[in-house]
Regions:
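Phosphate-backbone binding and catalysis cores of DNA-processing enzymes
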Residues: 1-150, 324
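Short amphipathic alpha-helical interaction segments
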Residues: 54-62, 148-160, 225-232
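A short, conserved structural fragment
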Residues: 65-74, 78, 162-172, 236-243, ...
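Short, cationic-aromatic polyanion-contact patches
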Residues: 81-87, 173-192, 249-259
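Positively charged, polyanion-binding regions of nucleic-acid-associated proteins
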Residues: 114-131, 194-210, 232
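Active-site-proximal binding-pocket segments
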Residues: 198-253
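Non-catalytic regulatory appendages
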Residues: 234-289
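Glycine-rich, small/acidic residue-mixed loop/short-helix segments
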Residues: 287, 293-299, 304-363
Length: 363
């Protein structure tokens, strides 16, 4: 018999486009999701890959090189992939609160507004005329100007410059990530009013992650409770509330209950939105397995998801042109599940353009 948690988790596989997708390009899926957590760069690319059919990593690299999708600090104090079409309104909406949360740390690092003004000026002059530089190359420019970059100051200087809308991710250069000037990389789009931005963010979230609660949205968006409720009220005519247990979930009016094949198996990356999008993850992750899946300091490990439930962990080991995927189930899997895992491992290899094999960890 299907439980409440089973239905919620299976519905999320559908809404997040993991079970199936109509989208064809990286920018389409990133736009659908609104923002996708991306501090683990390689895994974040796989998060896009699992939501598109027959995609390879080079296509995502191309989208990044062209500036169709950006990797930038937005919403919360961490990197996200965002569609270039959304970057300006999303930064305008979320940057002030993130900057406010960093004041104490910036005081500790002696990153005063005067220092930030100097670093911003250096960045703008150095990167003007479509110049793209790596983190280390920008570090050298700061050193020339006598600005310290130790004690994690460099990370926070660049972080602040992203929040100020000065820089964003540039094209990949010699297998290294670069920074570019945002206004040169992405022509300025039409600005949205604050209410329009709140409504748009809420629509993206609840369409792509339903069923979800207001508390889930507050966690993901990092909005204040007041702003989140305003957003909720602005879009409520397009959604309906459904109570499951004692919890109220928001679901689009146009959404229909999913039909998912038995033993649907997915190989999801670290920090995937399937888990990290929600404050309450209990519908897909039991309390016992949560301790193995999420570390005490907030690291989300790559997961094996069977029928919407986290059933194990996996990791990758690179050997020249081959990648070995180590599989660790929480409980012994059936033969059908193992066959499907083998297919998912092969799909991961095709995504990377490498041969694959997988090993099954046994106690």
């Amino acid at each position: 018999m299907e439980t409440k948690n089973d239905l919620i988790s299976k519905t999320r596989l559908i809404s997040q486009k993991i079970a199936s997708t109509e989208f064809k390009t990286p920018s389409e899926i990133v736009r659908w999701m609104g923002a996708m957590q991306a501090q683990d760069y390689a895994m974040a690319k796989w998060a896009i890959g699992v939501r598109l059919t027959n995609l390879n990593e080079k296509i995502i690299d191309s989208a990044i090189d062209k500036g169709e999708i950006l990797r930038i600090h937005v919403l919360r104090p961490t990197w996200h992939f965002v569609s270039a079409d959304d970057i300006y309104w999303m930064l305008q909406l979320s940057a002030p609160k993130v900057k406010s949360s960093l004041k104490s740390r910036h005081n500790q690092l002696e990153l005063t507004e005067s220092v930030i003004a100097k670093t911003s000026s250096i960045i703008e002059k150095t990167l003007s005329d479509q110049i793209c530089l790596t983190r280390d190359e920008l570090r050298n420019e700061f050193h020339k100007a006598g600005i310290r970059t130790d004690e994690n100051r460099l990370s926070h200087i660049l972080f602040r410059s992203e929040l100020d809308g000065i820089i964003c991710s540039g094209p990949i250069k010699e297998n290294k990530l670069t920074y570019a000037l945002l206004q040169e990389r992405v022509p300025h789009k039409k600005e949205l009013s604050r209410d329009e931005s709140l409504a748009e963010l809420a629509k993206r979230y609840f369409n792509s992650r339903c069923p979800a609660t207001l508390e889930d949205f507050i966690w993901w968006s990092n909005l204040t409770i007041k702003d989140a409720r305003t957003a909720f009220n602005l879009i409520k005519s397009e959604f309906y509330q459904e109570t499951r247990g004692s919890i109220k979930y928001l679901i689009p009016n146009s959404f229909s209950e999913p039909t998912l094949k038995n033993a649907a198996v997915n190989l999801l990356p670290a920090y995937d939105e399937f888990l990290i999008s929600y404050r309450d993850r209990s519908s897909s992750l039991s309390e016992v397995n949560n301790k193995r899946t999420v570390s005490d300091n907030g690291i989300f490990y790559p997961t094996i998801v069977v029928n919407g439930q986290v059933a194990g962990l996996w990791k990758r080991i690179f050997q020249k042109n081959k990648v070995i995927v180590s599989i660790d189930f929480f409980q012994p899997p059936g033969k059908t599940t193992l066959i499907k895992i083998a297919k998912k491992v092969s799909a991961f290899g095709r995504f990377l353009g490498k041969e694959t094999e997988f090993t099954l960890k046994t106690d």
